[in-house]
Amino acid sequence: MISQVSMGLPPPHLLRLIVSCRKIAVEVTAPRTSTIVAMAASDEPEFLVQNHARNTRFPRTRLCWDARVAARVGEKLAIRLHDIGVSSVEIDLDEELSRPAHFRRPAASLLGSVARAGVHVAGFDKLQYP
């Protein structure tokens, strides 16, 4: 397998998911400097009404976000990546495969929405979610 560095291409941007029971966030870092170039999260103003409704519901749910919210966060990230000219990102495959099963489905939804929006997600095709 030929690496991008040997071909003279710059290393790809790294997409990282930050997942908890309260929120899901995704950030894209620059390859050499590790600075964040784009970010989206489920606690942005667009999701406040949904979060409030979910938190005041009885019985309470354990997660404050689901696959639908994760997909919308992915769409927002893809729009921001298009705005700055990033067309390809890479995920840490080992980290994604080590996630608990109940976080994998929404993570797959988020990564799939980024890919459907036109940003190539390297490594997404190797993930197998339940």
What are these regions (language model features)?
Residues 1-24, 31-37, 48-130:
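Charge-rich, low-complexity N-terminal segments
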Residues 44-46:
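Flexible, surface-exposed loop regions and adjacent strand-edge segments
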